[in-house]
Structure formats: C-alpha cells, structure tokens
Amino acid sequence: VLCLTSSTDPRWAAIAVDDFATTLADHAHCEMKAATNALSLATRWPATPRVARALTDVAEEELRHFREVMALLEARGIELGRPESDLYAAELRRAVNLTSDKTPHGSLADRLLVGALIEARSCERFRLLADALAARGDALAPFYEDLFACEARHYTTMVDLAIEVRGEAPQVRARLAELARVEGEIAARFGVRPTIHG
C-alpha cells in the first residue's frame, strides 16, 4: 500500500475485529493525534502559508473523523479511556531524528514524511478492517472504506508538501523510501495487537 515496505500480519484484522471496542477506542485517539500533529506542524512553520493552510485542512478532516469515531463509541456504549503511549509513532520519530539533516526545511520535510508514513499505515489497516467487517456483515465496513480513501489522500498531501518545502522531489522520494524501510521494521516489531498502528 502506497510506500509501505512491509504488510500487516494477516492475523491482525481478525484480532482487531474480535476486540473491536479496543480497536475503536485506539482509532479515536489516533484521529485526535493526527489532527494535533497537523496543527502543530502548521504553527511551527508559519513562513510557509500554503503548507500551513493544507495542514489545517488535514487537521479539520482528522478532527471530523475523531467526532465520527466518538459517536460510534457512544452508540456502542464503549468508553474512550486514556490513550496508551504510541510507541510506534515515537520510535518512528526517534529513528528519523537520528538521521535528519537538522536544517529547518529538512526537519519540516522529515516531519511531513513521518506523517505520510503514519497515514500510509492507517490506510492499509483501514482497508483490512473494511474487508474484515464486510466479511462479517458489519455495517461499519463502508465507513472504513471511506477512511481508507481519506488516509490515502492525506498521505499524498504530506508527500507533496514535503516536496514543496524541500524543493527537491528526487531527494524527498529517496528519503521517503529510506524512512519507509525503517517504518516497516518498526511496524513488524509490534505484532498483532488490536490497535491501528502498533
């Protein structure tokens, strides 16, 4: 899917659907974190207004998804609870920081590429969830199909913004491929828990 170098373990979807309360609560937290991250990036680099506007649009869409997932939790009588530490995202950011060129544009481009990779993994997982839910006749399958398309669009937005910030498409694509290999190794270490990423 997109730039990913590893596929999710085939057992994950069944585990996620079997413990859907946990998966759905984790999904809500992921949407809020995605919105927060997009806004954080938009406000840290105000010198690039088009980038800030695009990231604000992403944040608004992620916040809408958060509201939708919260409504699903409420309808199913599931408590959101506190978020668990997102070790997947933390490890990915740590690995990127070790190899970043540390210039303002390089740092922003890397943060955007990390966002793109997280969107790509979400995209893959939502496709798997949509298929698994459809196989069980669950009415939420179309919801996850729609999210699959949204996450794919966010992935493209993040990559395009990284290219715009950096101004060097071949270098950005090479960096994305490098970071995608790291993401694949990190994702593989987390096994098959009923969470969206790790």
Give residue spans per PLM region.
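Non-heme di-metal
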Residues: 1-198
